[in-house]
Amino acid sequence: MLKFIKSSTKESEWLKNPKNEICFVGRSNVGKSSLINALFKTRVVKVGKTPGKTKLINFFEDERGNSVVDLPGYGYAKLSKEAQSEISDMIFEFLTKRVEIKKLFLLIDSRLGFTPIDQEFYDFLKEAPFEIIIVATKRDKLNQSQTYQIKKSLDELKVKYFLVSITKKEFLQDLVNNLFN
């Protein structure tokens, strides 16, 4: 079970003294909110059909008091350049100043692989003091050859990754087992 704690846009509003904090980040419409709902078997995280729905940093807590953070999506082209910049700045500020983060789950669309903006984001974060785990979503949309290609490209990064289907609820249990350990 997961419960909503608060939303914020600036550091003074962030959740204070979280326990065991994990964060989910990725491009708009990659499935961050849907993945959190699937992993925690809840519907507490608002999911929108339109990209760019999450514009705030949303803090949740599980039944053990662990903190789960749903960050806004980056790179949504239909937002103004100013709005895109504000969201990117908010994400970068959070990820560079937030010392409580234990793990960051970077979501990518497995159909697209690592896009230039995903690569830029990963390059920025790879020296961070927390573990980065790649979650390639929308596995159900891939054929066998495409699945092989995305696995091959992720293997080359030499980083822990999971290839999942949120809609079919496939390959999620291994990810659940890696959330807080």
From Swiss-Prot:
It comes from the Bacteria. Its cofactor is Mg(2+). GTP binds at residues 26-33, 52-56, 70-73, 137-140, 164-166. InterPro entries: G_ENGB_dom, GTP-bd, GTP-bd_ribosome_bio_YsxC, P-loop_NTPase. The keyword Protein biosynthesis does not apply. It holds the Pfam family MMR_HSR1. One of its GO terms (biological process) is division septum assembly. GO terms for molecular function: GTP binding; metal ion binding. CDD domains: YihA_EngB (cd01876). Residues 18-181 form the EngB-type G domain. Mg(2+) binds at S33, T54. Keywords: Cell cycle, Cell division, GTP-binding, Magnesium, Metal-binding, Nucleotide-binding, Septation. PANTHER family: ENGB-TYPE G DOMAIN-CONTAINING PROTEIN (PTHR11649:SF13), MSS1/TRME-RELATED GTP-BINDING PROTEIN (PTHR11649). Belongs to the TRAFAC class TrmE-Era-EngA-EngB-Septin-like GTPase superfamily. EngB GTPase family. HAMAP family: GTPase_EngB (MF_00321). NCBIfam families: GTPase_YsxC. Necessary for normal cell division and for the maintenance of normal septation. This is Probable GTP-binding protein EngB.
